[in-house]
């Protein structure tokens, strides 16, 4: 009857064939007193959404990853049902424009929290800090079990719990490295690996960005999908980056997209890497538009269709202008072009 019923807040759940469990839940519900307020997990700005323009499909990243069916198409934008949304954070991790931003955690608040935690660690004499991201259920329980029955976390591992690690995107990963963490480890529930494939794509994008600023290392970002605390502990004490870039601390204020650019620009400066295009994986939300200038008639159809303002006209001359930092790679301009003189290419400028 419900999509993603197990992810919805405010419900008591039991197997329909378990009559004893159903009776216990009924008794438990009867004893509940007070009000329940459904949390709002996502702050959505339809003005920034690049889902569609003029009936031409563009970005559908959030629709593709939402496991609860809380997001539906609504014309040129999408609609997010707060009653269904369970706060997995997937939409916030993949949204290229910042139209869908998670409230817990907000990208800028996350950056400030890990920076503050890092400052305290370094002031206490800590060395080679590593960041461990875990959710409040599976991840927190694994860490607790490691502390209770094992040797606990490594001394240089700084843990931070999140409502859901599904929000971990390339923006959070590169921000952590820029602030000074030499490694970022994410613990996910192995029972949900089919839902968290987007995290692998986000890590691949973060690795490509790191390679572009001369800080690539396979062990820089580590994803652990284990339920056994001993196996988690073994991986935490395993591979480490061979070399870390010089930190480039900054104030993470603004949209996830803007924060990512600040982090990469800072790392490029600390690594003495000149301005150059960074090759990115297919589907990356950064890149350029290639235009066949010999056949383009400057009809400006693409300008009026571009949802991000990346394509602009010159009011004083027949000229088509492009802002690479604004391009979302949604592909609407390519679909709009009457003569098919434009194409999209995945890359980013540091």
Regions found by a protein language model. Give the residues of each.
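Non-ligating segments of multi-cofactor redox enzymes
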Residues: 1-42, 46-47, 55-57, 127-314, ...
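Cysteine-centered iron-sulfur cluster-binding motifs in ferredoxin-type domains/subunits
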Residues: 45-69, 79-98, 288-309, 321-339
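Short beta-strand "wing" residues that participate in macromolecule-binding interfaces
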Residues: 73, 102, 313-314
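Short glycine/acidic-rich loop motifs that flank beta-strands on beta-rich extracellular proteins
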Residues: 75-76, 317
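Conserved small/polar residues in nucleotide/adenosyl-binding loops
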Residues: 340-347
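Structured core of small recognition/catalytic domains
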Residues: 89, 96-100, 105, 166, ...
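A contiguous, basic/glycine-rich beta-loop/short-helix subdomain that forms a polymer-engagement track
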Residues: 105-123
């Amino acid at each position: 009857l419900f999509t993603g019923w197990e992810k919805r807040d405010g419900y008591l759940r039991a197997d329909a064939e378990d009559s004893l469990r159903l009776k216990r839940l009924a008794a438990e519900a009867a004893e509940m007193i007070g009000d329940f307020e459904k949390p709002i997990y996502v702050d959505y700005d339809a003005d920034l959404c690049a889902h569609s323009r003029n009936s031409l499909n563009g970005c559908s990243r959030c629709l593709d990853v939402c496991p609860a069916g809380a997001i539906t198409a609504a014309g040129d934008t999408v609609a997010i049902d707060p009653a269904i949304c369970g706060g997995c954070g997937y939409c916030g991790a993949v949204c290229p424009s910042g139209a869908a931003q998670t409230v817990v955690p907000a990208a800028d608040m996350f950056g400030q929290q890990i920076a503050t935690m890092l400052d305290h660690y370094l002031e206490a004499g800590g060395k080679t800090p590593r960041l461990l991201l875990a959710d409040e259920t599976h991840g927190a329980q694994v860490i607790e079990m490691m502390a209770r029955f094992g040797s606990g976390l490594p001394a240089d591992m700084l843990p931070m719990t999140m409502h859901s690690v599904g929000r971990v995107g390339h923006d959070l990963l590169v921000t952590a490295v820029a602030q000074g963490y030499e490694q970022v480890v994410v613990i996910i529930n192995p029972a949900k690996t089919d839902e968290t494939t987007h995290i692998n794509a986000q890590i691949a994008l973060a690795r490509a960005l790191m390679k572009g600023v001369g800080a690539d290392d396979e062990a820089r970002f580590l994803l652990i999908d284990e339920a056994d605390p001993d196996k988690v502990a073994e991986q935490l004490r395993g591979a480490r980056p061979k070399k870390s870039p010089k930190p480039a601390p900054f104030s993470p204020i603004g949209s996830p997209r803007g924060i990512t650019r600040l982090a990469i620009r800072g790392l490029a400066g600390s690594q003495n890497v000149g301005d150059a295009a960074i090759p990115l994986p297919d589907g990356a939300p950064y890149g350029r538009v290639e235009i066949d200038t010999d056949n383009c008639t400057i009809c400006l159809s693409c300008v009026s269709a571009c949802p991000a303002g990346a394509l602009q006209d010159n009011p004083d001359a027949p000229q088509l202008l492009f802002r690479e930092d604004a391009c979302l790679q949604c592909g609407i301009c390519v679909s709009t072009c009457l003569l098919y003189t434009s194409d999209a290419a995945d890359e980013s400028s540091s």
